[in-house]
Amino acid sequence: MLGTALRRCAVAAAAASRAGPRGLLHPAPAPGPAAAIQSIRCYSHGSHETDEEFDARWVTYFNKPDIDAWELRKGMNTLVGYDLVPEPKIIDAALRACRRLNDFASAVRILEVVKDKAGPHKEIYPYVIQELRPTLNELGISTPEELGLDKV
């Protein structure tokens, strides 16, 4: 209803700007059939992604064997933009991608981002580190706390 009214106002304003001055002495002509507006519904017909599909999509993204440093950073930047803390399996895949690229700095930065995304919920980051501990040990990645970066 509001959208239709706004479209009519826009068409009337456009017609008024093309036709010249209007007022009591120069009434606006009635809109013809060319000015008729169809009501359009603006929905997204896409399906909604489940949590499992979301996780699988990101794990697949980071598990690409030919991922490069730019794609890794782009993926992490996009992932950080969401209003969530990534699941440990997504972070695991991202850390393994860092290892394939020999990018230790990005691996540590990923862990810093996870801590930052956890925000005031102090129980989330230790849980994620606990879940990732076998991967961190296997890949030789130190946490920011082990490196002393939390004190800087």
Swiss-Prot record:
Q: In which pathway does it act?
A: Energy metabolism; oxidative phosphorylation
Query: Is Metal-binding among this UniProt entry's keywords?
Result: yes
Kindly give the membrane topology term recorded for this protein: Peripheral membrane protein
Is Transit peptide there in the keyword field?
Answer: yes
**N6-acetyllysine: residues bearing it:** K89, K115
Which family does the similarity line name? Belongs to the cytochrome c oxidase subunit 5A family.
Going by the UniProt record, its keywords in alphabetical order are: Acetylation, Heme, Iron, Membrane, Metal-binding, Mitochondrion, Mitochondrion inner membrane, Phosphoprotein, Transit peptide, Ubl conjugation
- Name of the coding gene: COX5A
Gene Ontology biological process terms in this record? mitochondrial electron transport, cytochrome c to oxygen
**Gene3D superfamilies from the entry?**
Cytochrome c oxidase, subunit Va/VI (1.25.40.40)
What lineage, starting at the top, does this entry show?
Answer: Eukaryota, Metazoa, Chordata, Craniata, Vertebrata
Q: Where is this motif: SIFI-degron?
A: 2-22
PANTHER family, from UniProt? CYTOCHROME C OXIDASE POLYPEPTIDE (PTHR14200), CYTOCHROME C OXIDASE SUBUNIT 5A, MITOCHONDRIAL (PTHR14200:SF16)
Q: How is this protein annotated for GO cellular component?
A: mitochondrial inner membrane; respiratory chain complex IV
Transit peptide residue numbers = 1-43
Post-translationally, this protein is described as follows, namely: In response to mitochondrial stress, the precursor protein is ubiquitinated by the SIFI complex in the cytoplasm before mitochondrial import, leading to its degradation. Within the SIFI complex, UBR4 initiates ubiquitin chain that are further elongated or branched by KCMF1.
Quaternary state and partners of this protein? Component of the cytochrome c oxidase (complex IV, CIV), a multisubunit enzyme composed of 14 subunits. The complex is composed of a catalytic core of 3 subunits MT-CO1, MT-CO2 and MT-CO3, encoded in the mitochondrial DNA, and 11 supernumerary subunits COX4I, COX5A, COX5B, COX6A, COX6B, COX6C, COX7A, COX7B, COX7C, COX8 and NDUFA4, which are encoded in the nuclear genome.
Give the protein name, as stated in the record: Cytochrome c oxidase subunit 5A, mitochondrial
Residues with PTM Phosphothreonine: T143
Q: Where in the cell is it found?
A: Mitochondrion inner membrane
The GO molecular function terms of this record are: metal ion binding
> Matching InterPro entries, A to Z?
Cyt_c_oxidase_su5A/6, Cyt_c_oxidase_su5A/6_sf
Q: What does this protein do?
A: Component of the cytochrome c oxidase, the last enzyme in the mitochondrial electron transport chain which drives oxidative phosphorylation. The respiratory chain contains 3 multisubunit complexes succinate dehydrogenase (complex II, CII), ubiquinol-cytochrome c oxidoreductase (cytochrome b-c1 complex, complex III, CIII) and cytochrome c oxidase (complex IV, CIV), that cooperate to transfer electrons derived from NADH and succinate to molecular oxygen, creating an electrochemical gradient over the inner membrane that drives transmembrane transport and the ATP synthase.
